[in-house]
C-alpha cells in the first residue's frame, strides 16, 4: 500500500475550501443573462465553449489532492442537481460555496460543526417547504416558453421547446439532435416509432423517399423468427381475402418466408412489409406488448399458447397508417382500446417510480412517451461545430428546466425567490446558539445567487440584494434591462424543482465539508512526479498524459 499524506483540522478545511472556491469561481461567471462563457481545452479537436455549469465542473481536476477533494465535492453537487432536476447546476455550486465560506468562518471562530449542520438542515427544510408553497402551476404554452427561454437565454429556443411540448404532450419524448444545416428546427413524428426498418428494400412503395407506406394495414406481431412459409401462409391468405395491407413485426424473417413475401409484393398480390422487432431480451417483449396494446392486437407467442400457423385476423393489430424507412418504423393512430392503453401507461409510470437504474428509467420513459403518442426532434444547427455543441447543451438544459417546471410549478426567477423566503427563517427558534448560527448561514447563502447574477451584469450585488429585500414579494432584479420588476409578470421564472434541488444538494455537501476534521490522500513523491520512476511499480507513468 502506498504511503499517505494526512492533514488535520484547520489545514484540512482550508485546503478543501480552496478547492471549492477554484471550481465555484470557474462556474459562477456563467450565471444569469449576462453571464460569460468558459472555454474548455480538448485533447483532440478544437476547444469547447460552454455556458453550462455541470459541463465545466466535470472538466476540473486540481493538482493538490486535498484541494481536489473540495472541488470534487462541489462537482458532485452540480452533477447530482443535473441528474435530478436537469438544470440549476451553477446555482447549486454558488450556494455550496456560500455555505462553505460562511460555515468555515464560524467553525474557525469556535462554533461546533455538528450543531451548525443541524441548524443548516432545519433552515433548508423550512426554505424548501416555503418554495413549494409559493410555486405556481405551469399550464399555458406562454409559461412554458418563458421557462425555456430563461434557461436557454434565447427566446427562439423557448418557442421551439414550447411548440414541441404542445405537440407531443408533457410525457412525450423530445430529443435534441445535431442538424446538418445551419438552422434550428422542430420535427414531430406522430404515433409510435421504433428504430427498425424494412428487412428487404424490395418492400418499399416510394422509391424516391426509399420508404414503404401502408394505409389502414393489419399488423402481425410475434416474438418468433419466421423462416418457413407454412407458418405464415394461413394468415397471408386471410389478409389477402380481406383486401388489406400487412405489416409483420418479428424477431426476423428469412429464407423461403422472406422470398415468398418479396415475390408477392413485387407481383402486386399483397402489399406487405416485414420489420425486425425492436429492443432485446425482456425489453423486446415489453415493447412488442406495447405495440400490441396500441394497435389492438396480440403478441403471437408460444409462451402464451398462440401459434403463427393457427393465428386469425382477431390477433392482428390495426393502425390508420404505417410508414417504414430504412431504419425506422412509425405506427400512426393505432386502433387499440383506449382503456387498455391508459392501464398500460399507468403500469409503465409505476415501473419508472420503482426502478433504481438510470438506464432503465430512461428506456421506460421512452416507452411511455411512444405509447402516449408522439416524438419531437429538435434539430440544432449553427455556423460552426463549436457553436452547435454549445447551443445543443443550452437546449438540453432548457428542456430539462421546462419538464421540471411542468412537474412542480414555477417561482419568481433570477434568485428572487431565495431572497423572498429569508424572512420565513426568522420564525425558526433553535435551542442552541450554534444552531441559530447555522440558520443565519443559510439566510446569508440564499442571497448568493442574486448577488452573483447582479455582479455578472456589472452591478453591485449587495445593493441589488438590499433593494429586492425592501421590495414586495415577487419583485426582483431583471439583469438584462437592469430594472426592478415583477418577475413572473415579466416572464422571468425558475422551476420550483430546480430551485429546491439546487439548495438541498448544495447544503448537503457543504454541511459535510464543515464537519470534516481529517483528510487522507496518497503521498505525492515530488522526485518521481512525471518521470518513469524506475521499474518499482512503474510509479512515474502517471506523468505521461498521452491519452
Swiss-Prot record:
GO MF annotation, one: isomerase activity
NCBIfam families, A to Z: GroEL (TIGR02348), PRK00013.1 (NF000592), PRK12849.1 (NF009487), PRK12850.1 (NF009488), PRK12851.1 (NF009489)
Record has Cytoplasm as a keyword: yes
This enzyme's EC code(s): 5.6.1.7
SUBUNIT field: Forms a cylinder of 14 subunits composed of two heptameric rings stacked back-to-back. Interacts with the co-chaperonin GroES.
Superkingdom field: Bacteria
Gene: groEL
Protein name: Chaperonin GroEL
